[in-house]
Amino acid sequence: MNIKQLRLVIRLAEEQRDAATAQLASGKAQWQVAQDQLEQLQRYQGQYVVQAKQEAQRGISVQALFEGRRFIAELDDLIMKQQQNVEQQALALQSLTEQWMDAARYVQALEQLETLQV
């Protein structure tokens, strides 16, 4: 392969690596949003439980107690779904990281080859 062809291949590989970098950044942002939402749900649930306990100590109706428990169960379901979402985002992020690493190694190998040919 002549040097012009090699430089073209390097340029294309760099573009591929740059695209992988952008995808990785997007994947990290998506994971962070999912993680933040999970933490927000967990905080809200904790605050709601504390508030519900305080209200229960002051005395509330059976209906209000039932609705409070139902709401906490709904929050549990939301938290479980969000945990699954975070796990899926983490797996996607791992895949994007591997793709970026592969692209970066390929560029590095091509650049080493170019150095040997110059």
Question: Across the structure, where does each feature detected by a protein language model lie?
Answer:
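Charge-rich amphipathic alpha-helical interaction elements
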Residues: 1-118
